[in-house]
């Protein structure tokens, strides 16, 4: 038995902040016009009978969010000085992220033996803390004062441990100087960056025309030296190890790290799972790491420490990737996830042009501006704060008007990712198709079947598009009752895209909203 009903009309007037049209035009103006065919629009894409636009997603400054798992990379501000931090922080204050990864810049901080200049890093750290963002350091890279070899691409991608007592002592002194100087401000220290991806290479290997990475044992030796040096100064800090690049299957390297005893020296294991399809292989690699940690008998968190996507001519591609990267890590229970990176790199990274992995556009050095991915980030940080918890849900996607049992359509054509969260008693359901980021994907019409849990409030269903930041009222639903299967709710004629859409209750925007402060935008 099925009974379709029209849902009561409601609005969010008075509960959402007034739209700042100048800001919306800045983000959506030329960019949205240029890429309009790539972005979902309920009316244009044929879903107006089911979806009614009722408002835009709010945002919260990072300072107004107590805690979350969402972070951003702010790397390459060391001797390479790849972008203007002060222009970038204006935007990041309103991003909602709570973590920022920094590279410590030994080569920039110590240019005379034993003399450390942290003024530039003080400014960055203090600005982030004032914005409500927790900085964490990647201790990298080497320093020519202690390494008797020429730099590689302007940096010393060599382990201090292979340069004898001189290299080890110089590195230990530097790490301890960092810990003393930033004690009380920074408590998380990562050892190096991507040791398996030529950022920890054998000295001289570049001269042969083929870069050779140091073996896992050498990296673990560096981790041991670093961890012991740091803890002599600050016993309660957290040491992060691994920083593994995942461009290819690297389980052998990871196994080598644990065989060499890395678990004895770290509190957090970090990983960089680069793929064009963020859902591909990451769950199995994550489980491989969890199994190695379990074998060690240690309590070690796992962070997704760096992963991003360049614009590649279309801002929407990057925005799609950000939403899928964040959601993949959240649904798999990763303890922190960092998107690479905050701002395009203009200097010190490529010989020419702009390295456009940033969610802030730096094409014009005098006028930085946010990309679509920045707005998507704001949507995510609003939804996924310390009160939002991963939960099991009864939530299914089916071909529109055709049950799976009676269709001959290939499963791969419609195979969705689905997951659920709860914010108090309000459910948040997510669903999408995990296609290749660069593929052409048109909105598909599906039916959603769900059984709301007893704890949930779900009387005013809305659909959220995190990239366009639009909120839609769902107009119709069908309450189904069957003697064999019991009762469930069904929403027909719903869109499925290649990035997450969120189905939740409108009260998520009204309950307790008086506690949220909507600051004046500082990034116009």
What are these regions (language model features)?
Residues 473-524:
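C-terminal beta-strand-rich structural cap/linker in extracellular carbohydrate-active enzymes
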Residues 83-107, 123-127, 131-140:
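Catalytic domains of carbohydrate-active enzymes, especially glycoside hydrolases
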Residues 103-110, 137-154, 195-197, 246:
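Aromatic-lined carbohydrate-binding surfaces of glycoside hydrolases
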Residues 264, 274-351, 362-380:
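Catalytic-core region of carbohydrate-active enzymes that cleave or remodel glycosidic bonds
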Residues 1-98, 105, 505-524:
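Mature N-terminal, pre-catalytic/accessory segment of carbohydrate-active enzymes
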Residues 435-457, 495, 511, 516-518:
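Surface-exposed beta-strand/loop patches in extracellular or lumenal glycoproteins
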Residues 82, 149-268, 272-291, 311-327, ...:
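Active-site cleft segment of glycoside hydrolase catalytic domains centered on the general acid/base Glu
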Residues 6-22, 31-56, 326-442, 456-462, ...:
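Aromatic- and carboxylate-lined catalytic core of secreted/periplasmic carbohydrate-active enzymes
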């Amino acid at each position: 038995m099925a009974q379709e009903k029209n849902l009561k009309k409601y609005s969010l007037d008075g509960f959402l902040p007034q739209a700042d049209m100048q800001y919306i035009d800045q983000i959506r103006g030329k960019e949205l016009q240029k890429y309009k065919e790539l972005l979902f629009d309920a009316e244009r894409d044929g879903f107006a009978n089911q979806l009614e636009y009722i408002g835009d997603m709010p945002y919260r400054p990072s300072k107004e969010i107590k805690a979350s798992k969402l972070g951003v990379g702010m790397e390459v501000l060391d001797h390479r000085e790849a972008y203007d931090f002060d222009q970038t922080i204006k935007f990041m204050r309103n991003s909602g992220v709570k973590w920022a990864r920094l590279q410590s810049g030994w080569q920039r901080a110590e240019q005379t033996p034993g003399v450390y200049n942290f003024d530039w890093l003080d400014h960055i750290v203090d600005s982030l803390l004032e914005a409500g963002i927790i900085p964490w350091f990647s201790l990298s890279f080497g320093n020519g004062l202690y390494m008797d070899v020429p730099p590689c691409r302007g940096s010393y991608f060599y382990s201090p441990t292979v340069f004898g007592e001189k290299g080890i002592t110089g590195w230990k002194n530097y790490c301890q100087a960092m810990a003393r100087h930033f004690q009380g401000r920074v408590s998380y220290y990562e050892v190096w960056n991507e040791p398996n991806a030529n950022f920890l290479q054998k000295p001289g290997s570049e001269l042969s025309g083929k870069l050779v990475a140091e073996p896992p044992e050498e990296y673990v030796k560096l981790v041991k030296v670093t961890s012991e040096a740091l803890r002599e100064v600050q016993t309660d800090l957290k040491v992060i190890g691994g920083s593994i690049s995942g461009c290819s299957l690297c389980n052998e390297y990871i196994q080598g790290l644990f065989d060499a005893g890395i678990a004895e020296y770290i509190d957090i294991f970090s990983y960089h799972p680069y793929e064009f399809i963020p859902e591909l292989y990451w769950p199995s690699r994550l489980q491989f790491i969890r199994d190695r940690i379990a074998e060690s008998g240690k309590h070690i968190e796992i962070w997704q420490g760096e992963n991003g996507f360049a614009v590649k001519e279309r801002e929407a591609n990057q925005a799609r990737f950000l939403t899928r990267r964040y959601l993949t890590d959240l649904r798999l229970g990763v303890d922190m996830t960092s998107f690479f990176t905050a701002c395009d790199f203009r200097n010190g990274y490529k010989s020419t042009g702009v390295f456009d992995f940033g969610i802030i556009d730096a094409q014009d050095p005098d006028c930085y501006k946010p990309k679509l991915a920045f707005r998507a980030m704001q949507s995510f940080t609003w939804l996924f704060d310390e009160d939002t918890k991963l939960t099991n849900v009864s939530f299914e996607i089916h071909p529109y008007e055709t049950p799976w049992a009676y269709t001959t359509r290939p499963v791969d054509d419609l195979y969705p990712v689905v997951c659920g969260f709860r914010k108090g008693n309000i459910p948040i359901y997510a669903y999408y198709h995990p296609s290749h980021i660069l593929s052409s994907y048109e909105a598909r019409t599906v039916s959603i079947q769900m059984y709301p849990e007893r704890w949930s409030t779900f009387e005013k269903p809305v659909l959220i598009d995190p990239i366009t930041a639009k909120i839609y009222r769902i107009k119709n639903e069908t309450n189904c009752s069957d003697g064999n299967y019991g009762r469930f709710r069904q929403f027909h004629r719903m869109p499925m895209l290649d990035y997450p859409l969120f189905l939740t209750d409108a009260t998520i925007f009204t309950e307790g909203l008086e506690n949220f402060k909507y600051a004046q935008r500082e990034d116009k």
